[in-house]
Amino acid sequence: MAAQRPLTIALVAGETSGDILGAGLIRALKARVPNARFVGVAGPRMQAEGCEAWYEMEELAVMGIVEVLGRLRRLLHIRADLTRRFTELKPDVFVGIDAPDFNITLEGNLKKQGIKTIHYVSPSVWAWRQKRVFKIGRSTHMVLAFLPFEKAFYDKFNVPCRFIGHTMADAMPLDPDKNAARDVLGIPHDAHCLALLPGSRGAEVEMLSADFLKTAQLLRQRYPDLEVVVPLVNAKRREQFEKIKAEVAPDLAVHLLDGMAREAMIASDAALLASGTAALECMLAKCPMVVGYRMKPFTFWLAKRLVKTEYVSLPNLLAGRELVKELLQEECEPQKLAEALLPLLANGKTSHAMHDTFRELHQQIRCNADEQAADAVLELAQ
């Protein structure tokens, strides 16, 4: 009698964040089904957990229209080859991790062949290009969503979706140790501390750094002991920021950090940041914040017409109200930013109330996401 085939899960991750999620999912599945087989497109973390890589993740990790166009033939070839090979393999479940432009079409191809498909990490369909929800519904048996309002959106369109919580909320403590973070960064325990996070993209750093620095100068007049920490994602962004600082605020003493955004947020009394995942991380670090964002006028005009949400930052979307101040476009200027940050640096009622709400929201999305994702995969595999 032929031996029963082990549980076979196919996965495709397209970037580092997806590799981290994939590795966590594989780990959780292996704990329950030790002989399971994992194949697909994997990064180093997924491979370290035992995923057989038919293609390296770097093949898919392209950003920007020009880069994508340059690699389009190769990407289309990989997708066609994966469709053929997965169809032959007939895995119990296919999991497309993020990379929606690549994965959702692949999921649709496989679903037509009778293979069960999951899309892990919802694209921001609730915010813009909402009609994508119909393609997602046709292509997948289940969407795994990090945030409760994402599930509410899919429910409206009868697309099966499971809220699993956010892996970042699992990884961060409910009560971070501010003094320990200050010790790591060399910040005195009794000083006022402000974190500036002008974004991870070159265009953001270019648009925001000067105003963020001028804001810090205004706040230093009010709080002479103010320590300013500026975590930057890589050497390129650091060089760009240093150049702007030399022109705008050469005499402002700041702590420039390579990475270490999380430590900077935990150590600080308040943060001024561009929107994006940084705002969620800042909320989980229990650091009161102001979101300041500016883009080119035409891009903003277009975004206002495309984006369907009342708020841009994740803490506000989670709270369903303006929990943190959002100052956009012409509102994003030093005087207004400083006025919004002053009550937070005072460390009084405003920041304590914000801290308490951040903690409640953290608990809402701290659901052991790796285990929840594994549950969803195994239920679909039955």
Swiss-Prot record:
It catalyses: 2-N,3-O-bis[(3R)-3-hydroxytetradecanoyl]-alpha-D-glucosaminyl 1-phosphate + UDP-2-N,3-O-bis[(3R)-3-hydroxytetradecanoyl]-alpha-D-glucosamine = lipid A disaccharide (E. coli) + UDP + H(+); a lipid X + a UDP-2-N,3-O-bis[(3R)-3-hydroxyacyl]-alpha-D-glucosamine = a lipid A disaccharide + UDP + H(+). This is Lipid-A-disaccharide synthase. InterPro entries: Glyco_trans_19 (IPR003835). It is an enzyme of class 2 (transferase). Pathway: Glycolipid biosynthesis; lipid IV(A) biosynthesis; lipid IV(A) from (3R)-3-hydroxytetradecanoyl-[acyl-carrier-protein] and UDP-N-acetyl-alpha-D-glucosamine: step 5/6. Transmembrane segments: none annotated. GO terms for molecular function: lipid-A-disaccharide synthase activity; phospholipid binding. Belongs to the LpxB family. The lineage of its organism: Bacteria, Pseudomonadati, Pseudomonadota, Gammaproteobacteria, Enterobacterales.
